[in-house]
Amino acid sequence: MSTGELKANAREQLRGYWAVAVGTVLVTTILIDSGALYTVSEYFDMAEIGISCNLIALFLGGVISTGLCKFLLDIVTKGQEPKFKTLFSQFNIYLKTLGLNIIIYLSIAIGYILFIIPGIIISLMFSQAYYILAEDNSKSINQCLSESVEMMKGYKWDLFCLELSFIGWWIIVALTFGIASLWVSPYVKVTETNFYLNIKNK
């Protein structure tokens, strides 16, 4: 499936669900996007807030990311009615999501320390792990990571190009001081979910 088809599907799938998608992705960003929150902390010149934001992202990032993936899968597959509360549905496997988040975070961080390209490659390799766990909570951390790596063989460049295709939209986000991200972020996330299902079924 081409990038254009993935995006077209996302727009169609979001029809009727924009409100709940915007709210869910916005809360996700507030809770785990430490970069955005750190910018706020710098504005108030309070370094301790920045540290707190990073800790929140570390300890909540895994469980919220897995919940978001489950929510996004509900939108795309129409298996269940997408609900905001799904974002918080994965606390029953909190320790597993925490371990997964820490391993991914440290692996990507080490990759970026060594050089930017290894960091990008590692992030692409592990990009499907949360989706895998969201679909099957019984899978171990190692299974989620290894299946993501295997799934992304031959598709890392495709995902990289897919992300690049949203540059125009992110420029609009910047020009609107972030307001447009309310609509752009759900659009991107649902498109990424379509990408996951597309390569999973091959």
Locate each region found by the language model.
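Hydrophobic alpha-helical membrane segments
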Residues: M1-K202
